[in-house]
Amino acid sequence: NRHLARDVTDSGRFMTLSFIRFDRSDRSLHWVRAGHPPALLYDPSADRFRQLIGRGLPLGVDDQYRYEEYIDTGLCAGHIIAIGTDGIWEASDRQRNNYGLGRFCEVIRQNAGLSAQAILEAVFNDIKTFTMGARQEDDITLLVAKVGENLQPGPDYVI
């Protein structure tokens, strides 16, 4: 962050980032946010979404900013982590209606029993259907991860 801030100070540009680490030993999720939209954690057994919120300025804004790590413990098999750019919920159809976070969550909910790859494809297919070829103003980027049944000891997963 210090180097980036020095490089971009005069330009007014910045970069967002989310760093997420899943610790297999205790099934905990650790994250740091730097201005990026919060990731979502979906618990299908409780049918509950939660945003992985936390403070964090975009990278390059303040070279002295100290980022905080946040932790969530006790993730279970089937929990889904989705992190994307705001271009997903801001995707618009020809009438300029936004796709929305609610619709995004509903597609995840309806496909929660599938693999992470299949959930990702379902979201992109639904966005494509919704937008009907309308030109988008922002990038649409998504990563989906799903906690497995039988996690073996090993290195942490980093998203």
Explain the meaning of each model-derived region.
Residues 1-159:
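Conserved subregion of the PPM/PP2C metallophosphatase catalytic domain
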